[in-house]
């Protein structure tokens, strides 16, 4: 049996779909469907069962899944970087992750979990080492803290954490303001022909802030590779290894539609000091572990994503 937490979310649902494509339907999907629109992410997927995240945790603690689970892909978390309820974040992200790790350690179950590039905060280097980790918000701190916990353990199972950089692609529409800029630029262009980007900040020209934009399909491939290589443990960056600008994303959206323009808007005061103007994954450790697949560029993946979006109809549209 395979468990995917956050299964109705962005990366989790893409992972479930990819497992289906590999012929695996023996999947327990774990999530919180308070936002019922997330069910659309699983509507075309095959699963064995669905469990609410709290119910699943209770059954894990009670030992009801002992010896029954092959791997847990732990993608579930509150991923809002603007959420400042620290008590909620610690319970939902940190303590929950610890409980699942303790289960996997006890039952020798593989544990592959979502960390985040946000742990690097304002760092200018993105290498998996302690002196470069400077979280700027409580979400990032919750992820950082669990990575620290993992480092101090000596579990009897595979434990692999992936520090996701700026992931974009199908099945992210439920994320609202936290969805990718590719998603928002596409919506803006369809609405009024204009992609709105922030003006320059931190010494960057307008729209030239740089991020490591990584396509969700590639993120899923790394997760599956780790599952298939159970001897690999550790915390790894998961990005393309090549930063691209917000202008690059906007231009890819405009090129796909064959129309549109860019407008630069003032940088919000509330984000100053809590914003990463540059991220670029250092993939040295992931490559050294044996991962050889290439990652799609913005120019390659954005058209693929927008073609998928054009086939979808979402609630509220």
Swiss-Prot record:
InterPro entries membership: Epimerase_deHydtase, Heptose_epim, NAD(P)-bd_dom_sf
Reactions catalysed according to its record: ADP-D-glycero-beta-D-manno-heptose = ADP-L-glycero-beta-D-manno-heptose
Organism domain of life: Bacteria
Binding note for cofactor: Binds 1 NADP(+) per subunit.
GO MF entries: ADP-glyceromanno-heptose 6-epimerase activity; NADP binding
Enzyme class: isomerase
Annotated pathway: Nucleotide-sugar biosynthesis; ADP-L-glycero-beta-D-manno-heptose biosynthesis; ADP-L-glycero-beta-D-manno-heptose from D-glycero-beta-D-manno-heptose 7-phosphate: step 4/4
Gene Ontology annotations of biological process type: ADP-L-glycero-beta-D-manno-heptose biosynthetic process; carbohydrate metabolic process
Cofactor(s) needed by this chain: NADP(+)
UniProt-annotated binding residues for substrate: 166, 177, 184, 198-201, 211, 275
EC number(s) per entry: 5.1.3.20
Alphabetized UniProt keyword annotations: Carbohydrate metabolism, Isomerase, NADP
Tagged with keyword Nucleotide-binding: no
Binding locations of NADP(+): 10-11, 31-32, 38, 53, 75-79, 92, 143, 167, 175
Domain notes: Contains a large N-terminal NADP-binding domain, and a smaller C-terminal substrate-binding domain.
Subunit structure: Homopentamer.
Family note: Belongs to the NAD(P)-dependent epimerase/dehydratase family. HldD subfamily.
Cited function: Catalyzes the interconversion between ADP-D-glycero-beta-D-manno-heptose and ADP-L-glycero-beta-D-manno-heptose via an epimerization at carbon 6 of the heptose.
The protein, known as: ADP-L-glycero-D-manno-heptose-6-epimerase
Species: Shewanella piezotolerans (strain WP3 / JCM 13877)
Gene behind this protein: hldD
